[in-house]
Structures are given as C-alpha cells and as structure tokens.
Swiss-Prot record:
Keywords: Hydrolase, Metal-binding, Zinc. Zn(2+) 1 binds at H53, H55, H110, D127. The lineage of its organism: Bacteria, Pseudomonadati, Pseudomonadota, Gammaproteobacteria, Lysobacterales. Pathway: Secondary metabolite metabolism; methylglyoxal degradation; (R)-lactate from methylglyoxal: step 2/2. Belongs to the metallo-beta-lactamase superfamily. Glyoxalase II family. One of its GO terms (biological process) is methylglyoxal catabolic process to D-lactate via S-lactoyl-glutathione. It comes from Xanthomonas euvesicatoria pv. vesicatoria (strain 85-10) (Xanthomonas campestris pv. vesicatoria). GO terms for molecular function: hydroxyacylglutathione hydrolase activity; metal ion binding. It is an enzyme of class 3 (hydrolase). Disulfide bonds: none annotated. This is Hydroxyacylglutathione hydrolase. The gene is gloB. It catalyses: an S-(2-hydroxyacyl)glutathione + H2O = a 2-hydroxy carboxylate + glutathione + H(+). Its EC number is 3.1.2.6.
Amino acid sequence: MRLIALPAFDDNYIWALIAADGRAIIVDPGQAEPVLAAAQHQGLVPSAVLLTHHHGDHIGGVAELQQRWPDLELFGPADERIPADAHQVGHGERLRLLDVEFQVLQVPGHTRSHIAFVADGYLFSGDTLFSLGCGRMFEGTAPQMFDSLQRLASLPGETLVCCGHEYTLANAAFALHVDPTNAALQRRQQEAQAMRHAARPTLPISLKSELATNPFLRTGRPEIRAAVAPRAAGELSSEVDVFAELRRWKDEFRS
C-alpha cells in the first residue's frame, strides 16, 4: 500500500491509501475534485471512504464520489450528521479493507462523535491531533479532548500521523511561544518552513516527533506548566487543567 495526500480547499488534506492494483481507501473527502483528478491522472479507483467527523470540509465530496462510484462503501461515526448510508463504527471495532486492518478509536472533543482510524502504521486523526497542535473543541470538553489525545499518544512512536489540515507552521509559532527553548521544536519549524517553501506537505509526521514537540501532548512537562501558570485564573491541579488553559491560550493567540 502507498499513501498520498491530496490537497483540498486552502489547507485540507484528503488521504488516499492505495493498493498495487489502484484500488484506494479515501479518508475525509471534503471535496470530490482532488479524488476525481487522482483517478484520472494516477489510476486511483476508490473502493471505500472513511469519515472521521461530520464537518463539511471532511465529508462534502462524498455525494459526488458516490455518483461516480455507486458501489463505494462509507464508514463513519454514529452521528446523524454523517451520510445516512455510511456504516456506523465505534471504538475498538476493526475493519478489513483491501487486506488492511483498520482499528477505530473514539476521540471526542473537536466534535462529540469524532473517531480516528489506525492502519498499516498510519493514524488518520482528522481534526483531533494536528502536527504541533490539536483541534478546537467545538462540541466536546477539555477532559474529553485531553483523554482523546492521550489515547492517540499511547500508540507506537513510529506511527505516522495523517491529520486533516496543513497547520504545521501556524502551530509551530504558538508552540515556540509556549516552549521557546525546545531544540527539537526549533528544528521542526525550520524543516517545515523548507518543506512548505518547496510546496511539499509537512505530513505525515511520526508520533515520536509529536511527543517531543507538540505542547498539547506535553502537558505533564514542567516547562509547559510553567508557561501556562501565569495565565490561569486558578490552581492548575491536573494535566487536564494545564491542557484546558493551553487550549484557551491557543484560541486567543495571534502570531
């Protein structure tokens, strides 16, 4: 299997995991056009679509893809805002698609029903875990999002994170504001700048690298707590408190 990132909108990625015969599993097709173009120019033939959550920039292309490939199978979370013909999958379930086993993880926070998929060494994290960041909490709570990130952080370090947006440079600016002496983070920013200058995706990225540089996965570190503490209205009695304040800070941050 090979993996390609299909850029969509301004900063989205649609992920395609492609078998040797061209059949492909598509993750979060917010637009149909990038998938249709890949089918035309690269011989890609979608056989299944995986949906992490209901937002339009992740599911907006589904109907057009179904028109082109009527036998396309859909899999997504149990949520009335997901296309009704999708197979509903939940935490711990396993799917076998194109001889690859996908594990479903429940990761609420960004939305109440958000899920992630793990397969073949890849983590398709949607808008839960980003490169050097995490998603906004539109429907979930800080404890939910913290637990979801911890669940993803427990995966093997060599797992490659395939998230839904190209946010690395924007997230690096905030991460360095919080953790300015982190040498690994400084290197990642420089590498990401070079990659974007060359019009290359900064993804996927190893979970090991994220654990060393992403402040939202480092809320137990004393330097992160120390950076957050002056902003907190009350005592930071747990990592969840640190995370919640860090997320509020990110929401307000302007580089």
